[in-house]
Amino acid sequence: MTSRFRLPAGRTYNVRASELARDRQHTEVVCNILLLDNTVQAFKVNKHDQGQVLLDVVFKHLDLTEQDYFGLQLADDSTDNPRWLDPNKPIRKQLKRGSPYSLNFRVKFFVSDPNKLQEEYTRYQYFLQIKQDILTGRLPCPSNTAALLASFAVQSELGDYDQSENLSGYLSDYSFIPNQPQDFEKEIAKLHQQHIGLSPAEAEFNYLNTARTLELYGVEFHYARDQSNNEIMIGVMSGGILIYKNRVRMNTFPWLKIVKISFKCKQFFIQLRKELHESRETLLGFNMVNYRACKNLWKACVEHHTFFRLDRPLPPQKNFFAHYFTLGSKFRYCGRTEVQSVQYGKEKANKDRVFARSPSKPLARKLMDWEVVSRNSISDDRLETQSLPSRSPPGTPNHRNSTFTQEGTRLRPSSVGHLVDHMVHTSPSEVFVNQRSPSSTQANSIVLESSPSQETPGDGKPPALPPKQSKKNSWNQIHYSHSQQDLESHINETFDIPSSPEKPTPNGGIPHDNLVLIRMKPDENGRFGFNVKGGYDQKMPVIVSRVAPGTPADLCVPRLNEGDQVVLINGRDIAEHTHDQVVLFIKASCERHSGELMLLVRPNAVYDVVEEKLENEPDFQYIPEKAPLDSVHQDDHSLRESMIQLAEGLITGTVLTQFDQLYRKKPGMTMSCAKLPQNISKNRYRDISPYDATRVILKGNEDYINANYINMEIPSSSIINQYIACQGPLPHTCTDFWQMTWEQGSSMVVMLTTQVERGRVKCHQYWPEPTGSSSYGCYQVTCHSEEGNTAYIFRKMTLFNQEKNESRPLTQIQYIAWPDHGVPDDSSDFLDFVCHVRNKRAGKEEPVVVHCSAGIGRTGVLITMETAMCLIECNQPVYPLDIVRTMRDQRAMMIQTPSQYRFVCEAILKVYEEGFVKPLTTSTNK
């Protein structure tokens, strides 16, 4: 049937045109918004309105104060090419298909620190977002961290663990990760029991504090292909632009390095600053799948740079001719920046707001397989970190970090004289204190173990909302290609990266008058339970570097937090005092009449320091070759670039900043066995214990020894260097040491300490004198010879098992040139020592036993150094921070101090530059 028909008078009537005219008069459209609690809410708006109108009605519905962190993502776009609703563009021009339209309410900008979010309700929205991203596979997460995050989520939703109510299988109706295995629930339940006393708000804060350490936290990915037609991913984040290829981060371009980002048609360009040795600036080009994908990536870069790096958005450019014609995109980010958002939240946030949390219905959501979606672009277990500075927080996320709920006394400088009027009391708690080295410069010994404080949970849980319907977005694979043409003259969409104006504080920084008074009394051993670093002599502010759980510093209200800057100690200004003087001031508090320590701190000032150092962060280059290179040349290029990055990082100091931010203990790893009553005496230091998952287990009834397996895999080779990192034997653990050596088949022991340093016993002599023999249980050790020089000693021994009547030759290599305090001034002797170790263990597959006193500091330095040498030989890039992270995933606190880390970084650079170890054409074993 046609739309035209002839009337008797010979006239026509166009039915379709009439219907279109009718539709044009109906301007109201329906937008279905999928919220973060998996509910769908319909909103009616005028299709001619700007996108901001729809955003405003959604924010009003949610009663959301801190709005600038969130946005609406178009649901018809795939997640690998995200497109956000533009607040300054008419809705009808963005939503092309017929009403109703579907959009997803999501977090758009992920803050680096949850303390920047002022309202508990805002943090709850973040919590829902990240929980959803992990469940759907959008945010890959290692299993141990996933279990810890899930336990915080359970604590938030179910409250305290109750053995009578939380029976076996009480988590069977919940899903937290894709393809969740059955034993995963048991691990969650075990961790859930450790969170007794945490309120929902505290559990969610700890959830966010842990989630921000994930590799892909806050990264928005867009897919592309390189010159070999291999898939790469271009990620946009707060710090700059990332390039991933074959699961490996190939490079990072910080905003400081980028001059301009631009696009034309489907070609996206990054223009980099000119290096000193370069004659002109570098222009990188990438071919996207189409114009829309290219512009989406460009807009994401503009928004992230403006939000995180500028104090305020750039004003629109005024041009007389702009009314008549335009060239390029008129898009500019016009919302609040992070600086403005934090300040706005402080002024407008309702911190006493009460709201109802939605119960999880995770099984209603159809899970997505990340591996299938990304076509092996990323793996949650095998993602390799190469060039991006770590975003991990200082230390392990603390289970009782509640600065967001306990508002401290806010003081201005004019009120400092009245500090004595503000009294805060702490609750007593039983604590255990670690041993402290006389060479330590810490204010107090680290206190790690304590009996849990008994806190009364909240009076009641907020009412639960009805079960929600869930929804899943489709993920479509998009293909891109890579271009390196220099098309400077053909670009029609540009965004110049402005130089940051002088500003009093970096983005999100805390104003100088935002001070908090903290009071605490020492425990029965005279310890406060926190460490500080910095001082006038170190040209750094005094920063709290660690707060141990269950200690006075942890239990006081307001709580002392890692990253707080100490301004006054007992009313004394410490701005011009050295580190040692600051330590003495803190110790002297125990001798005061009141015995009380009074600190005036600037909360979380460490983030000011970190962001200020971003101005001097190392530059990274990613310069595609004109023709595909063979793998050997590619590896050599990556190795050279990693050494350039390391050298610049040592000059600017960013390597130490990144090291300070790395977790000391891997989140989720337990050390329960070391704390059993029968094993406590076997630990040389109370705060240095082996992980349960990687500890060496002895045969027999008493199976404990303070030792961990550490395996270091060398990529692109068959090499896996196996170590056993352990503490120096005590008089009553020598038998355990030799039993471990025998059972593990080890034929080499590397010792990195002398027996006594500065009057303190660091290691008991667990071997006999030359030509002598000693028995240790059923093991007899004979020392045949001892020779060496001023730096190291070689001992040839025989280990004899009297029960089995079997013997084994054994070599002990002891390094004796490490100074009593600090690190060696020159690494030459140490590098010679490492080379001897490598030569002695060549061809051996059994683990090498390595120990110093605690088994973490110098032991970590040696393992890092040998691993770096192997990587150089195999033409692989060397990233020391990744090596330390890998070690700490297997034994806590490996490489103990920043000075040790700097020493090994300088030694690695020396090995490369002076040719101690040279790349081989083929990967061979040592």
Curated annotation (Swiss-Prot):
Which Pfam families does the UniProt entry name for this protein?
FA, FERM_C, FERM_M, FERM_N, PDZ, Y_phosphatase
| Domain called FERM: residue spans | 29-312
Q: Which domain of life is it from?
A: Eukaryota
Origin organism of this chain?
Answer: Homo sapiens (Human)
Q: Which GO terms describe its biological process?
A: protein dephosphorylation
The annotated topology with respect to the bilayer is:
Peripheral membrane protein
Enzyme's top EC category: hydrolase
Name the UniProt record assigns to this protein: Tyrosine-protein phosphatase non-receptor type 4
Alphabetic keyword roster: Cell membrane, Cytoplasm, Cytoskeleton, Hydrolase, Membrane, Phosphoprotein, Protein phosphatase
Q: Where is the PDZ domain?
A: 517-589
- PROSITE patterns, A to Z: FERM_1 (PS00660), FERM_2 (PS00661), FERM_3 (PS50057), PDZ (PS50106), TYR_PHOSPHATASE_1 (PS00383), TYR_PHOSPHATASE_2 (PS50056), TYR_PHOSPHATASE_PTP (PS50055)
